[in-house]
Structures are given as structure tokens and as C-alpha cells.
Amino acid sequence: MKKKNICIVGLGYIGLPTASLLANSGYDVTGVDINAHAVETINRGDIHIVEPDLDAFVRAAVVSKRLRAFTTPQPADIYMICVPTPFHEGGDIPQPNLDYVLAATRSVAPLVKAGDMVILESTSPVGSTRQVADVLEEAGVDLTTVHVAYCPERVLPGKIMVELLENDRVVG
């Protein structure tokens, strides 16, 4: 069985470690970030964020040609949305801002084809995955032919690589 190609949107504290681990496991991974400096840095085999052990994983993934970074999404079989979910400014009760999640979904929607999987991996509220599916459907994606899933983000800064390697993860 052919290994799937993976496109990870968002190369920050979740996306880049995930991309490097998948690439070092033998998957062809394209990483996407709107920050051109981050993309250039990653493609040199360097990192633009501070996280213990991440530099070695990224360097190995880039040297093996299994990880490449771009500023726009590339065709894949699996799309992982790993962008921030900040809170809206103001208000008495903090409300999550899904603008980055929905923009990332819109960016991959034209590439999603039958049999593909789209995974939201972000600290986001109940109903976020449904909103991702709605954006895909609005873009013309037939939801009966693709898989849409959620994977909670559960790592501690400074221990991300260890936790990604050792913690069990659920995708559903």
C-alpha cells in the first residue's frame, strides 16, 4: 500500500513538530505557512521557533527530502490544519476566533478530492470540525467522499517532541 502524502497547514509549535515526525517516519510531507521567512528557514533545514530537539528532526526531514515547506497548499491525500485558535479581543467572556482555522480550510478546499482526509488539530471549541466540514462543502467538496476528523492538541511547550512521540493520540 502506498504511503499517503500529507500537507500540514501551519508550521508553528504543533504543525512543524508534527510535520518533522511524519517525514522522519517515511511520509512525504509538505508544510504550509503564510510566513515566507519561516518557509525559507525550514527549507534550509533550520527552525524559526524554539523547541528542544526539534532542530534535529527538521534537519533530518529536510535532508531526506521528505519535508518541504511552501507558502501555499500543495496536493496531498491528507490535510492537517494546525493553525492557532486565539480569542476575540474584548467582551466579558472570551470567545474563540476561528478565522485562522477557516482560512486554512478555504486554502486547501480546492485541492481536496475523493478519498482524502482533512484533520483539524487545534485547541478549538465544540462545533469547530463541523465548521471545517461546512467550509469544505461550500467550496464544492462532496463530504460523502472525504473524511473530516479532529485531533485535540495536547502538548506542553518545551516537551512537544517527547509528548508527540510518547503520548497516545486520538483522531476522530
Predicted segments, located by residue:
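Glycine-rich Rossmann-fold phosphate-binding loop(s) that bind the pyrophosphate
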Residues: L11-G12
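N-terminal Rossmann-fold NAD(P) dinucleotide-binding loop
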Residues: G15-L16
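Redox-cofactor binding/interface segments in oxidoreductases and associated redox assembly factors
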Residues: Y79-I81, L120, G172
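Rossmann-like NAD(P)(H) cofactor-binding subdomain of soluble oxidoreductases
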Residues: F87-R154
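Short beta-strand and adjoining strand-loop segment in the mid-core
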Residues: T123-P125, V135, M161-G172
